[in-house]
């Protein structure tokens, strides 16, 4: 009702970003150690958070879901992302989860374990295939001066 009366469109421009670091802590896969009543509550919580992330994007909220182990994150949260940035993943299950979510072939998925420091696989849902990208070293002094921090 507020949006209808205020003239805000259903697909607002990005206004805010929330970073979910170590996302597996709140977006655990539904099958991991969840049995009985507690499991139902935990699974429902993950479902509600994933749904909220999907809905809040419409209102200009962006989410960055970060985890060193994509296999420890609920697959619905991974599917719900548009851009995936994958750096070296030594664990096979993590490579498969991230690689399949990025439209990679099995031979490409194996190569994720061999990526050098600073090289990432980048994929967006409307791309035909993922690309390799060199990521520059983080320079916090440059960032601080750019944003007057």
Cite the ranges covered by each PLM segment.
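C-terminal lobe/lid and adjacent interdomain/linker elements of RecA-like ASCE P-loop ATPase modules
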Residues: 112-116
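Conserved P-loop NTPase motor cores
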Residues: 1-111, 137
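Conserved P-loop NTPase motor module
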Residues: 118-149
């Amino acid at each position: 009702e507020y949006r209808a009366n205020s003239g805000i469109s259903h697909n607002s421009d990005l206004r805010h970003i929330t970073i979910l670091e170590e996302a597996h802590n709140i977006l655990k896969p539904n099958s991991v150690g969840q049995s009985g009543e507690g499991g139902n509550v935990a699974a429902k919580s993950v479902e509600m958070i994933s749904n909220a992330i999907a809905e809040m994007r419409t209102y200009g909220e962006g989410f960055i879901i970060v985890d060193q182990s994509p296999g420890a994150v609920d697959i619905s949260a991974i599917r719900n992302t548009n851009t995936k940035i994958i750096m070296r993943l030594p664990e096979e299950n993590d490579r498969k989860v991230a690689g399949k979510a990025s439209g990679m072939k099995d031979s490409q998925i194996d190569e994720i374990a061999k990526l050098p420091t600073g090289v990432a696989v980048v994929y967006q849902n409307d791309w035909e295939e993922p690309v390799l990208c060199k990521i520059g070293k983080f320079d916090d002094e440059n960032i601080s001066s750019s944003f007057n921090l």
